[in-house]
Each structure stands twice: as C-alpha cells, then as structure tokens.
Amino acid sequence: MADLKITWLGHAAFLLEAEKKLLIDPFISENPKAPCTPEELNPDIIAVTHGHRDHLGDTIEIGARTGCRIISIHEVANYIKSKGVFAEGMNKGGTVDLEGVTLTMTQALHSSSIDASGFSFDGGSPAGFVIGIGGHSIYHAGDTGIFGDMQLIGELYEPEIALLPIGSRFTMGIKEAVKAVELIEPQIVVPMHYNTFDVIKQDPEVFRKAVEAKVDTKVIILDPGESIEL
C-alpha cells in the first residue's frame, strides 16, 4: 500500500491521504470539474490557502459536518469562526504539527478578499503550504505569481512534489510556472488551477513539454478524480 495518495479534485483542490486525510482548498459544489460532492469528503484536516470563493469553497459546510480541524491564515480563520465553525489561524513562516501532518505556511503573490452577502471582508494575505504527510514533502503553491523565494522554498523544504497553478490571468501562466519548477527543483510537478473555466484555459501538454525541455522534473497531468500514489 502506498504511503501517500494524492487526488486532484479539480481547480486547486486536492485530497492527500496517508494516516490522516488532508483536504486543500475544497472548491467542490460550485466547481464544474469536481469529481465528487462535498458530502463524499470526510477529511481530518482542511487547509485553506486564501479567502477567495474558489478556494475557501465548501470549507465551512464540510467542517460543520465532520468536525475536522481547519487551518488558514488568521483572518480567514476568524471569518470561518464567525460562521460558527472552529478554525485555527497561523501565518507565513510558521509551522503547525497536526499529529502526523505538518503544515508550513509560505508566501504567495495574490489577493485574499472574502466575498459574501454582497460585501468583501478582509481575508488577510494569500499563502501556500509545504505539507509533511506520510513521510513525504509536498508544496501546494496556492494562487500565486512567480517569486524568487520559490528557490528558497525548494532549498529549505526539498518538496518531492510541487502543485503549481498554470492558468494565467489570476496566477502564473505556463511560462512562469516552468521557471518556478526550475527554482523549486521538485521530483514531480502537477499542474493545477487551469481549465476550470474558459478564462483560465490552458493546454497542460505545452507545460509538460516546456518543463521536460528544461529540467529533469517529471510532469504528471491528472484529470479531476485521478490520483498519484507514492
């Protein structure tokens, strides 16, 4: 049996399964590419990279139903708590140990408002996570543009797998994501945050060819619902 199973749920949502189940950015019910319903997900932990609707997603509903631990930047955690669901805040540079899963919050270049009831609430700063789970290190970049300290993330945490956005417009596009792979130097990269909507339509095969022409990193392209086992 694999030590770790990583399933792409479309957009930036992933389910990581080892001794515990970690759900990242559960944008499910409004995601046209989602391979499941929120009711089918029973995580031990949810990690939220930022407050935008396509990342906060179904966090509150899943948290209320399962009682799982929810981790996010301080301001997003406060918003979740205002809805009657317990959440735990952290900030960039910090690490939390969740009894077998570690989350280290990293920089991301993006924004993080929370839009609800016709108003925008302060969502703090966007973030990524370096995740320690099942004996492996995984970097989920969140929504981000490229930044030079991705190299430092690679040097400090040596992630085996990087989950990187390639959709452009709101995040890195293919050109920038290829350079990010060069900076991070993971063994495997999985593209995400593309083709959910026409406005972020990209051909992941173009990304694969560009990466493989530059570095030895293996590109794994998943369809929503497909998994990697390590």
From Swiss-Prot:
Show the Gene3D superfamilies listed in the entry.
Ribonuclease Z/Hydroxyacylglutathione hydrolase-like (3.60.15.10)
Protein keywords: Hydrolase
Which molecular-function annotations from GO does this UniProt entry contain? hydrolase activity
Is the keyword Hydrolase in the record?
A: yes
Source organism's superkingdom? Archaea
What InterPro entries has UniProt attached to this entry? Metallo-B-lactamas, RibonucZ/Hydroxyglut_hydro, UPF0173, UPF0173_UPF0282_UlaG_hydrolase
* PANTHER family recorded: UPF0173 METAL-DEPENDENT HYDROLASE MJ1163 (PTHR43546:SF3), UPF0173 METAL-DEPENDENT HYDROLASE MJ1163-RELATED (PTHR43546)
- Could you tell me which NCBIfam families the record lists for this protein? PRK00685.1
Indicate the family of this protein.
Answer: Belongs to the UPF0173 family.
> Could you identify this protein by its name?
UPF0173 metal-dependent hydrolase MA_1308
Q: What is the lineage of its organism?
A: Archaea, Methanobacteriati, Methanobacteriota, Stenosarchaea group, Methanomicrobia
